[in-house]
Amino acid sequence: KFKIYHPGGNIGQTLLLVKDIMIKERNKIPLINFNSNIVTAIKTISKKNLGIGIIIKNKSVIGIVTDGDIRRGTKNYSKKTKIAVLMSRKPLYVGENTSAAKALSIMAENKITSLIVSSDSDYKKHKVFFKPKGILHIHSLLKYGIK
């Protein structure tokens, strides 16, 4: 409980895990069906306000798409184009028991602002397709003082 009640302290920061601060609520996670078109993806990404969409097929992650990917892609594709055409395959992700500090380090190294969160068993097996448990945005890390 120390990590929850004292998140701003050095000890609290090192104890916080991704699962403690990730977005877990399904209605807040930007999930997009792989058959959706660009317009549907834009609406979902805008509504969830994270700048990213998680592309799902059969309840498993198959890729991601960012608002920047869509902006660049609309020059070459119609609004009816399936979002799977624009997605990045094999997105970076972390297990739910990864330290928040490690997650921030991964984001900084890869110049990204969000990480998909999986179960630890999927993460340890390095699964290509996995069920998302949540999403971690850099703003959540900063809110808890993770550096």
Task: List the model feature ranges, each with a label.
Residues 61-64, 126-135:
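Glycine-rich acetyl-CoA-binding "A-motif" of GNAT/NAT acetyltransferases
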Residues 13-16, 23-27, 40, 46-50, ...:
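Short gly/pro-enriched beta-turn/loop segments at secondary-structure junctions
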Residues 1-16:
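YjeF_N-associated NAD(P)HX repair module
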Residues 52-54, 59-91, 96:
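Helical hairpin unit composed of two closely spaced alpha helices linked by a short loop
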Residues 6-9, 25, 140:
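Glycine-rich beta-alpha junction loops
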Residues 14-29, 80-91:
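Bateman (tandem CBS) regulatory domains
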Residues 31-49, 74, 93-121, 129-131, ...:
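The conserved cystathionine-beta-synthase
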